[in-house]
Amino acid sequence: MAEEQTALSLSWVFGASAHVKHGVVNLSDGYTDKICYLAANTAVIYDKRLRRQLFLQGHTSPITCIVTTEDRSHVVTADTGPEALLVVWNVRTGLPTRTVQQPHRHGVSTMDMSADGQWLATVSAADPESGEQEVSLWSMAALLTPPEAAPPGQGPLRPLVTTLVPAGDVQHSIRFSPNNPAELISNGRRRVYFWSWAPGSPRFQYYSPPLRSRDFKQSVGDFVSSVFVPGTTQALTATTDGDLVVWDEQGIAAQVGTSATDRRAIKLMRIHNCPITLLATVGDFIVSGGEDGYVRFFDPLLRIVAWFEDLAAGPVTSVAFSAVLPDRLAHADAADTLNRFMVPDFVVATRNSRIVSVQSASFEEYDADRRRGSSVLDSLLADVVDLAAHPTRAEFAVLGRDGGLQRWDSIAHCLLGGRAFERQVGACLTYSRDGSLLVVGFGSGHLHILNADDCSDLYVMRNTAAGLVRVAVSNTGKHIAAADENHQLLLYAYLPYKHTMRWEYVGRCRSHHGPIASVVFGESPSGQTRLLSVGGDGRVVEYDLAASSVAAGVQVASFYDFPPGGGAPTSLSFAPPLAYFQAFAADTHLLVSGADGTVASWDINTAPLERSATAAEGAGGEARWAAVLGDPDLLREMRDYFVYAQIKTQGEDALEPRDVPGTVPVDLVPDLMRSAGFYPSESDIDNLLHHVQYMAHSRNMESLEVVTLADLLCLYINHRPLFNVTHADIVAAFRELGGRGDPGSCVPKLSREQLLSLLQSTGEPMSGEELTAALAALTGAHTPEKSMPVSVAAEQFSADVLGFDTTEAGAEAAT
């Protein structure tokens, strides 16, 4: 039922947010075998037995941290950003139990749950300007209570304890003590904080012990993560040098006058020969993960008891344990468990976007292959830069920045094959229309034409020293176009050569003075192949393929420049009835990729869109555009002006009965725009009138002399500026025009003569009469010279001439 009501529904997520520390939690409890991992804005619950995914959706920003309750019934996720959320999810249903909006001003960067499951600690994301952070403590009992079951009159859920972190080092890790939930440890790159709290207190007590390299006669690397040693008073901090800093309450504390509970660094101990990437605890063991992919277990005395060094999965980012011991250990005799390594089975996530399931008993295996674990999911490239859907099969290809290429089955969700291009930087790829070719472009300028089935090379060409950024194949499969970083379009053609055919380089053309955003082939109504490109310079160029040849090079047929001020174009596509799209497969799936290392497959259901369109059509175009406008007061005002314009057109003093046709002449459109607060320039007016004529063509009319209210709303919504002009824009304009401030002042100034001259000579110049009339209306002065002082500051011009409230602008800037 839900799918019928949603145009897009997430069907599968390939890959995971491999860079997030502790980004995987193990939900296996003896009855189910599930994990939950982060994939950009979504948390994915994956059932390893049934091979099914359940999606926890609701975050608008990438999720930064995840924890689970001890009984694995709930998971908690949090993110950072302007609409940050902290959400408690029911694992069985996939629905949120409790949602906290803005748990911190900028969201949550890291969090941890106490061993008894009663408390949740969060560390806020750093303020972008001040770097300020805070540590908070939440009651899990309150977070697990649905809003409808909360006591009546209870306000928004807030933390019980909150304390600002002293400035100087952004904290990125926090952990509870397994021995005492009233103690926590956090660390940044160079400082460690020990936190403690007492029931009823609104603030943490904290202490940050000093650490100097000369104390250990060696340098100490940046801190990665910190934990308490189970059953002891010690704490550990892992470093990028592969060392553990050991903190304890013993030593010289009494001699320096500090409290006996204030820990100090007493030892530096190397446990990896590479940077440590992860530190955690399970039972009485300390668990470490390294850049080398090794996972090691230590007892409370820091003696190594087990090591898993054959995983070969990449740098470790997460180690997550099942809630129970495996059956073979849970029911073993005491004699059998003596001196045996006993921990629950676990999963290891790595920076290579791999998730590996490991049986703890495999440590005792002699065969290295049995110690590698089993892959939970085929791993997607962690640095996807482009993807392409196969036009005829349920497959897609992804290209990684490091030169990796993979082919995936979008139904079985498995890896079909791939290839690694050594010493190449991936840039772009696309399929030919029949799916037989896969064309790949690289940052070196190389263009590889591959067999789409086995990814073997058919042709390799390099005709530019600049990196390729876009590539396209014609519908006939006879032309390939590529764009490079030097704003050039390169054209290749499949031409006869000695009784056979081969790909030939036709030439290149620099028709843009900005980055090329999109290259696309299409077909004219007569069936001729067309090639167009659009650039960030606002230019659309069409190339003459018929006139282009190896001898003549690439020929330009025509070009069109978008008016300035409308934003830079980012893509170009031919409208239907073209049957194939780069990101579509048989019109049933939409593939979406980003810089987060994931590819999402969405099911497309057009029924809700058709119902919405039918309902809007039945309600009239005005209702549709009114919904888009979303401002009832402005809509009412525009409707009043529209009615007044009809009356004014017939004559305000007319005595005969009014005939209100529901339309106004096109000539009144600019004035109606101004009445709504949009003051179009002459160029904007030209664009409005062009849009009106486009409306006429879409209605099979030669021209349109009148517009309806729905037409007016359409024009307003499509042409109004995204943001209003602000005082900051005026200041920037003064600087652009050469304004200089007084010594020690950053406020730009222009002379009155210079400003008046610029208004009458640059941009869309005003005549002397127009300028005098405008300044008189704005300031009441009879002459331009009396409307402003000899030297005009940007702030004076904004406040005294344009009427901006600069005090509010200054207050907003200050906040």
UniProtKB/Swiss-Prot annotation:
Assembly mode: Identified in a spoke-associated complex containing CFAP61, CFAP91 and CFAP251; the complex is associated with the radial spokes in the axoneme. The complex associates with Calmodulin; the association is calcium sensitive.
Disulphide bonds in the chain: none
Matching SUPFAM superfamilies: WD40 repeat-like
InterPro entries, per the entry: WD40/YVTN_repeat-like_dom_sf (IPR015943), WD40_repeat_dom_sf (IPR036322), WD40_rpt (IPR001680), WD_repeat_EMAP (IPR050630)
Gene3D superfamilies for this protein: YVTN repeat-like/Quinoprotein amine dehydrogenase
Role: As component of a spoke-associated complex, regulates flagellar dynein activity by mediating regulatory signals between the radial spokes and dynein arms.
Protein name: Cilia- and flagella-associated protein 251
Subcellular location(s) per record: Cytoplasm, Cytoskeleton, Flagellum axoneme
Keyword Repeat among record annotations: yes
Keyword annotations from UniProtKB, A to Z: Cell projection, Cilium, Cytoplasm, Cytoskeleton, Flagellum, Repeat, WD repeat
UniProt organism field: Chlamydomonas reinhardtii
SMART domains to which the protein is assigned, alphabetical: WD40
Gene Ontology CC entries for this record: axoneme; motile cilium
Protein's GO biological process: cilium movement
WD repeat residues: 58-99, 103-148, 166-205, 218-257, 271-308, 379-418, 420-460, 463-502, 511-553, 573-612
Highest taxon in the source lineage: Eukaryota
